[in-house]
Amino acid sequence: MADLLYLPKKASSLKIPAWLMDKLASLGLTMPLSCEALHIMDGSSYTYSSYKAQQQLGWSAGYPKEEFIEYVSHLATQLSSAKKGCSMKTKHLSCQWGHVTLSLESAQLLSVKGNSDNAVFFGQGYGTAKLRLWQLDLSRRVASGRLSEIMGNGALRTDVFQRRLGLVELAERATNIDCAAPTHSWQAMQYQHIQAYTAGINQALSEMKVLPIECLLLHYRPEIFSISDSYLLGQLKYFINSAWQYELFHTRIANRLTPKQHQQLLATFSHEGHQIPPLPLNENGDWHQEVVKALKDGLKGLQYLGLASPDTGSNVIAISGSLTQSGKPLLATDPHMGHVNPNFNLLCRLESDEGLNVVGSHFPGSPGIIVGRNNHAAWGMVGIMADNQDLFWGKLDLENEQVETASGNLPLTKNIHEIKLKNGKSHSFTTYSFAQGRLVSEKNGYGMFLRWPALDDPSGDITFYQLAKCQDWPSFRDALKHVKNSPMMVGYADIHGDIGLQTMGYIPKRHQQIGSLVLSLTEPQHQWLGYVPFDELPCEHNPERGYTLYANQYSESLFTGKVALSNRWHPPSRSRRIEALIQHTDQHTTETLTAIQDDKTDYFAQQAKHFLLPFVPEDKMLSQWDGNTENIQASRLLDVWFQHLTDKLLGKVLKRGSRTLYTDFWPSCRWSILNILQHHIEDWQHEADALPDLIRECYATALVASQKMAHPQVEFQHSIKKPIWLNKLLTGRFPYQGGNRETVHATRQNADFLTQSQAGKNKSIKTKPYTFGPGFKLISNLANRGECVYLINTPAKGSPFFWQLRKTLNDWQAGKRKTTRLANKQNNNE
């Protein structure tokens, strides 16, 4: 006889979508139209374990009926609450640090108020766990290499790689450093804040009767959080910028090119209009001998290891009072990242009686605010593409646990790991490391080691507490000196009228600017020479032009004459477009900065048309187009045209795989291709007089292909990928509305054209979704001590079902921002 489950009363009048009822019915579930009861049709078994159901649900073992009922009840409750949107009742808490009150000021913003800073961080931890427990635990499992315990064998390779990095050991070292620090030091204060934050997480976990739906689906309960878990997620931030992946690509592709081809294909185009060579050149325009040797050695290392076969955009803008309507500065920031559900960030407002008064983005796992504002100042962060990681290869002697280096054979530290799998089995393997790197790959007696700054010193500021309390330019810069993880360019503005940019993070010093290549451990010239001192990092303070901006570009005014930070930068498309929009008026307001943040005009397209269109007089679309990518048909045509030009132009020199990697890894690929077409086509084995035919042919094929393409979607993907029907329930989406990887509102697909342009003559081309773009947008008006205008693309509450994302995604598409105002309080250290 079927078991009967009575659902909450609030679900009784809910109309369940027919498609969902059909899906439940196909799994042996029936649901009355009134939704007053739900039947589990499982015959006589006490376990929901029919083979067919297991396959459809993606479970490898029988699921206890009581917990399956709990899951379906949770699903029905989620369906019901979708009608009311995301809400959270005001919560009053007491802890050893004082009293704290939590509420959702809006569906996008968590508000935490307490009578001490530690009480506030306790509340922030509590609220984060209530809203994002799955995200917290998933991040912890990724960092520690424990995904396979809940996701099965499909996550094993990820776990093995993470165990090779050894982030848990680094986190424990960082924890011990802060724990042992002098009582009144910033490290000791950070430890206390993390202690309070972790206690809040565990308080919420202990009270939680209904776990996040992901935990019910995967049949597990998260463990309590330790203080070192927070430091662990801090270590994970080192890999926001995975420079080492570019080093693999750069070493492979550079060995297939002549110096001329290499400079043409991988040059940096500065904001000021010059080309910066990707590797050091001598006076004749050839590579230095050190570069030649490094290229050959790097390729040799990849061949030994069997790896010889063959990104992001953000903006920060600060405008001084001389160019604003109020006479006070404005600051806008919009970090770009992968579109995920839930968002990597949680917007929070933190207020305490001890002077903490800040609003902005919180990275779940560590207390505090990373990007935001207080009553005195505002700040935003942008990745600088810094080369703060290196790949080294060397000869191994694992029997004697040694590696060959420039200093002779050095001992390796050996650790044996056991990864528990979801099916009850385990996987054992061995990791090796030494002071200069973690062994991430080994083959034929050679190893690849990854080095990053935390191996030298895993400590550092991960809570940004001093930044949250900064009051002026000097205290702002002081607050950044202890930040060591992923290097950033930080934009700044304050109520005193100051604006500026400051680089932060640990960046290695090197003999030569060749950190973007895989290097040999036996070469003394490849060893790190310490780190660039903070006061030598690029910065800009109160420029005469009245504004400062950074959009991942190479600006000669910032970087020329400084220690080399990278060989890879974004093109100046966004920075030049932003600059042009800033120069439209000297009366900027929150509204004008909103328009800049949401701008989808392709600056590069506007420039490229002047060269390309004379070759195709038959064109009727692009000649009338102003570059606004919201005209999807015209924008798509230009994109596909450049994709076909890239494929055709490079086809005689680079294989298909390398061409795919190039368009994916190199942000300035369109600028480089245009430059080659204009000046260097013969260097790529094409006759000069073949240029007109090549451009026309690619236009014709692009026109046909672009007209066949289905309208793409923008997707916010969940980490649970299988079964497919479940992933669809957990993925938010909306129709693509313009933007590309070079517009201010940047969005992108990865290596899209080579996988989408091969459809048959009469078939439509299915386009990949756009899965990268702005994570949130903040604008701070310094004329008002507390005003912050904000917008984020997923709600604070981390419910994964797509129907609960609709309201927030609709606001995101429409650019519908909300405003919050901090209390008019003074910091306790004024």
Region roles according to the model:
Residues 643-724:
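Charged, long alpha-helical assembly modules
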Residues 352-368, 372-377, 381-522:
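Glycine- and hydrophobic-rich flexible loops that cap the catalytic core of alpha/beta enzyme folds
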Residues 48-55, 60-87:
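Amphipathic terminal alpha-helices
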Residues 2-43, 81:
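Terminal hydrophobic/aromatic helix or amphipathic segment near a protein terminus
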Residues 485-585, 643-646:
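Hydrophobic alpha-helical segments
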Residues 157, 174, 198-199, 454-478, ...:
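Proteins synthesized as precursors that undergo proteolytic processing into mature forms
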Residues 89-330, 335, 341:
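Substrate-recognition/specificity elements adjacent to catalytic centers across diverse enzyme folds
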Residues 564-617, 695-830:
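Terminal end segments
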